[in-house]
């Protein structure tokens, strides 16, 4: 075990990049229309899909050396990158096909796309003319999708030495790709925050909106909340919400000797404290977990809950409004999935109301946390 950990550490050192990949965010003010109807949501969705497809297609022309340089890596897993690209193309085709259903209402960004070859062809020649109503959006969107694609490709390039949300190890891992179109699940990581903090505010706000979310709690933080308040108050905190676990500590569970104890100890605490709120889901911190963990999770009756829309609301990254705009752009691109915020961060309590206001008339749905991943 110690030798394996040392080898993994050496691989990480060899693959260290010179500078972090820029976090993608897009000023939605560059888009000239509000998402005030399902049809207008589809217009914006088609535009983002085509722009991302353009970037994805262009990335395929990079040779091994150029791709390593772009991602800032010395070693890449080309097979994992190729597999991710195939998945992305399939998702883009599915999403564009659905988004075309409103073309009779508004034909903006509607092209004849009936199969993968058609989509690749349209992506290759996609551009926004200088006199277009949407020209102010084009360049910022292109930058956003280049950066977002780099985020995804870099994670695939490091897989499986560094596991993440972009690739699954088995059917016990879920990420919302089976949701219906326009259906999203809200999730929050890293909590609970201290008494009367952001977790309290977010849970109360969701109840007022008649919504729910899945909160992935850290065992140590949850135990501290109980000690500084009471079990009854913690149960009241999460009333109407779902609570999964993120382990006992917020640390990678891929090379931690005590990772199994971290999972079982925290899951038992949540289940004993809040049996009505508990959902048998484990959210790996940073998305990092072991490749051989399927048997363990199945023996515990747990599923691994991943995500596909990351708000990047961690400290030192995006501001609250930038985080919201990033999430909204990815909702337009992926059209369904699992959104992750951190309920220990002030940004979430700013970003969430803005997000709900921006999408209120878009025809979206919010997945009931009790029904997700059943």
List the model feature ranges, each with a label.
Residues 159, 165-167, 173, 202, ...:
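Mixed-charge, polar/low-complexity N-terminal
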Residues 160-177, 195-197, 253-271, 324-327:
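Short, composition-biased local secondary-structure segments
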Residues 20-50, 291, 296-334:
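Active-site-adjacent pocket scaffolds in enzyme catalytic domains
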Residues 2-185, 197, 204-213, 335-374:
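Terminal accessory/targeting
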Residues 116, 121, 128, 132-136, ...:
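Metal-dependent polysaccharide deacetylase catalytic core of the NodB/CE4 family, i.e.
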Residues 267-269, 329-330, 364, 372-374:
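Short, intrinsically disordered/low-complexity patches at protein termini
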